[in-house]
C-alpha cells in the first residue's frame, strides 16, 4: 500500500503521515526532509550551488540514505532556506524523484509506505493507493511553524515566519 500526503507548508502533513504510518505499520518518508538534507550537505561541503556541476549534485543526492533518522538540525530556518534553493535545481529534483519513488515501491521495513510532501500525489506518486491534500489558513500554519522553531531554540519573529509561509 502506498499513501501520498500533499499539502501546503506547516499544514500538518507530517503529523498525519507519521500517525498513519505508525497505525498501519508502514514505512514513512517526509520528502521535504530530503531537500533539507541536501541543503545541509551543501552547507557542510561549503558548496556553491551556482557553480556545482550536475554530476556533483547527482552524487550528493545519491549519497543520501533514506532509512536514516534525520536530526533536528534539518528543521532550522537556515536549512529551510537552503532547501528552497536546492528544490529549484532540476537535476536535484529529478534525482530525488527517483529516490522517493524507489522508497515507495520498495519500503525498507514493511510492505507499504506513507510519503508526505509537495507534489507527492500529483507528480511523485500519481498512482498511489490513497492520496490526501492537507491545507490550513496561513496564520494557523505560521503559528505551527513559529512554535516548532521556538521549541528548537530559534529566535525568529512571527511576521518573518508568516511571510515565509505565504511565499511558499
Regions found by a protein language model. Give the residues of each.
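ATP-dependent small-molecule kinase phosphotransfer cores
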Residues: 34-112, 122-124, 139-143, 147-167
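Hydrophobic anchor at the beta1->P-loop junction of P-loop NTPases
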Residues: 3-7
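Walker A/P-loop
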Residues: 14
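Short, well-ordered beta-strand core segments
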Residues: 129-133
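Walker A (P-loop) phosphate-binding loop of P-loop NTPases
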Residues: 10
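Post-Walker A helix-loop "phosphate-sensing" segment adjacent to the P-loop in P-loop NTPases
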Residues: 21-31, 47
Amino acid at each position: 500500500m502506498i499513501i501520498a500526503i500533499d499539502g501546503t507548508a506547516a499544514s500538518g502533513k507530517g503529523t498525519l503521515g507519521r500517525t498513519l504510518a505508525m497505525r498501519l505499520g508502514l514505512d514513512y518518508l517526509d520528502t521535504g526532509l530530503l531537500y533539507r538534507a541536501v541543503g545541509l550537505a551543501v552547507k557542510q561541503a561549503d558548496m556553491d550551488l551556482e557553480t556545482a556541476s550536475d554530476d556533483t549534485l547527482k552524487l550528493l543526492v545519491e549519497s543520501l540514505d533514506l532509512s536514516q533518522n534525520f536530526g533536528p538540525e534539518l528543521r532550522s530556518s537556515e536549512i529551510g532556506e537552503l532547501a528552497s534553493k536546492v528544490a529549484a535545481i532540476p537535476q536535484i529534483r529529478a534525482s530525488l524523484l527517483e529516490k522517493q519513488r524507489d522508497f515507495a515501491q520498495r519500503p525498507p521495513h514493511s510492505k507499504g509506505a506513507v510519503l508526505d510532501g509537495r507534489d507527492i500525489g500529483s507528480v511523485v506518486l500519481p498512482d498511489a493507493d490513497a492520496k490526501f491534500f492537507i491545507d490550513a489558513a496561513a496564520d494557523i500554519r505560521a503559528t505551527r511553524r513559529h512554535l516548532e522553531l521556538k521549541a528548537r531554540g530559534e529566535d525568529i519573529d512571527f511576521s518573518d515566519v508568516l511571510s515565509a509561509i505565504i511565499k511558499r
